[in-house]
């Protein structure tokens, strides 16, 4: 396991599991403390060079084949290679666990609950981020006036590979077996994960609590561990 965030911090969870060449990220979220050092409500990364800023500030890990190819090509960070990341397992759709999904390649499968998908859809519809789709930023075409224009809308929109998981229904991602178990939290659709690898088992608690409407689910997860 490589921890690219979420250690001695609130949020920013980005845990990379590598077993026999199968590579899975668990969450891809924002660290509030880290972002707060550099950005504010009205000051964020540069729109067309955001990946450069996130690398230079040490907010995102430099892993080729992980990020959206239009950004990677723009900053001369590859973009034409195959990805080695097999999937992202999303515990839930709070920004400290999912905020950086818009930076990812669209062909990396994202496994999440139906509730998490709906929450991210709301992010897409009410904001400018791209959780369920990717809109290529640098695609251009020759318009009717013979001038170069930037393509927008459906011409540049690519759907992401969203895979809906079901509670307590195990599945496999190559050599890793995944068991998604519901837990109680302040939003619906939260899942903890138990991963079975060739080197042993890993439990990711997500954010959980022992009170609320689904407290029994949290107890069941603890027992399963």
Task: Label every PLM stretch briefly.
Residues 85-96:
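Metallo-beta-lactamase
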